[in-house]
């Protein structure tokens, strides 16, 4: 997802997609700020992205800047304690300039979230941590995501967009398949996936 956004914004070429997760490619499973333009920090599955976003949002407030900060996280990485510490800080410092988008597809590299470590009632937890929660039943609906991003933020509250998504949506052999979490398709699979997405 993040590489598609970077390509749409002109930071990288779409031609790079064919090199995803290949040796010496700039497009690895976890974005590398030293190799990929448009990435502010190298983060990964340990939840550092939300902590960095909280720091950026707090810094912007401290400097009096009208800056909005966005963090995109997965539900699997939301099992990390660092995420919850960052959420607690975001609410404590009333970071209404922070939006956290949670891709909630129920799958991660080792299986389903419930098999690995259940997040329980995630909406209730986000509210309890002081977030203005926007829940999207179809997080694959980009119009709904755009509307959620455009929704005004409640003063003094960070915003969480909980997007219930389907991993691999629209590609028959990838949809809801945990094995595709960090795997790049071969040339034949790539062509089939592109054809299915065009239809």
Placement of each model-derived feature along the sequence:
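Short acidic, glycine/serine/threonine-rich loops at helix termini
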Residues: 3-4, 32, 82-84, 110-114, ...
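Glycine/aspartate-rich loop-and-adjacent alpha/beta segment that forms the canonical ThDP
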Residues: 131, 139-142, 146-199
